[in-house]
């Protein structure tokens, strides 16, 4: 499993990349592997304010539907619209083109409560 060192991780298998008060969120390589072929992604719209652990969307795979949880609180500033037509990108590139949302962080220090790559590798 791929677990980049520059990201934060949650127990629910979401990742967070923080840059200048904003963050990008997606699901981990482990999560996409466990889900199998992803066939549909539904995300909350831009402008939605959510708290840490709130649901920001769902992914539907051939064998299950899984809810997506906010790793930190914030306001959605962008969604990956490519996933509407090509949800399989999440399977192909979960840390790159398969990103899901970008957020403006409500409390940037919340990210420090999440796991680093080494701790996440122990969970998976």
Curated annotation (Swiss-Prot):
The keyword Transport does not apply. InterPro entries: 2-oxoA_DH_lipoyl-BS, Biotin_lipoyl, GCV_H, GCV_H/Fam206, GCV_H_sub, Single_hybrid_motif. Binds 1 lipoyl cofactor covalently. The modification N6-lipoyllysine is found at residue 63. One of its GO terms (cellular component) is glycine cleavage complex. It holds the Pfam family GCV_H. It comes from the Bacteria. Residues 22-104 form the Lipoyl-binding domain. The glycine cleavage system catalyzes the degradation of glycine. The H protein shuttles the methylamine group of glycine from the P protein to the T protein. The glycine cleavage system is composed of four proteins: P, T, L and H. Belongs to the GcvH family. This is Glycine cleavage system H protein. The gene is gcvH.
